[in-house]
Design a protein with these regions (language model features):
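Conserved, mostly hydrophobic/aromatic
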Residues: 22, 41, 48-51, 118, ...
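Catalytic cores of alpha/beta
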Residues: 30-42, 158-170
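Active-site-adjacent beta->alpha loops and helix N-cap segments on the catalytic face
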Residues: 1-12, 54-66, 73-86, 106-112, ...
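N-terminal small/glycine-rich loop or linker at the start of catalytic domains
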Residues: 8-28, 61-67, 89-100
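Acidic (Asp/Glu)-rich catalytic clusters
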Residues: 10, 42, 86-92, 119, ...
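N-terminal glycine-rich anion-binding loops that anchor highly charged ligand groups
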Residues: 12-18, 45-58
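Glycine-enriched alpha-helix->loop->beta-strand junction motifs that scaffold or abut catalytic
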Residues: 44-46, 118-124, 144-151, 168-171
Length: 171
């Protein structure tokens, strides 16, 4: 069975248009407004990315770093991110939602506990910016077992050989 993310890309391809994927950081503005923001952008977006803030977002640009800083100042915690997702998915079950963030928070919570929270809140996919291939293989397998897409990143400097391996191992 295809994932919601794959079905969404299929739908966009059939309509001969690119998918609109939006991004916001949970808790930037306020915890309560995060849900309102997701609901508003979901009316136009095909897939939503929701960042879980980290205190040292070194792989992100200035805009996301600033958003993460504001979210943390607003007191956002990982448990709050899952509550936001769960509330959003209550009325938007078919809209794919991808969490994006850093492995340190997953490590602190424990991979299995983190993935359990992802599944129970309705997360469809994960982007973990600081967990590269092949170090991510075990975590990727755990995601696959739980039907959570693990989205890996490529850069313009990724070699063709490495790209083939990453694509082969993606789901």
């Amino acid at each position: 069975m295809k994932s919601k993310i794959a079905l969404t890309f299929d739908k966009c391809k059939k309509a001969k248009r690119p998918a609109l994927i939006t991004y916001t950081v949970a808790g930037d503005n306020t915890k309560n407004n995060s849900l309102k923001i997701l609901n508003k952008i979901s009316k136009h977006a095909d897939i939503l990315e929701l960042g879980f803030p980290h205190n040292t977002p070194i792989a992100d640009g200035g805009q996301i770093q600033g958003s993460s800083h504001r979210a943390l100042e607003n007191g956002i915690k990982l448990k709050d991110v899952f509550q936001i997702v769960k509330k959003f998915k209550k009325n938007n079950l078919s809209k794919p939602l991808v969490l994006m963030g850093y492995y340190n928070l997953i490590y602190q919570k424990g991979e299995n506990n983190f993935l359990k929270s992802c599944k129970s809140s309705g997360v469809d996919g994960l982007i973990i910016v600081d967990l590269p291939y092949p170090e991510n293989k075990n975590f990727s397998y755990k995601c696959k077992k739980r039907s959570i897409n693990f989205i890996q990143l490529l850069s313009p400097t990724t070699s063709k050989d490495r790209m083939k391996k990453i694509i082969k191992d993606s789901h």
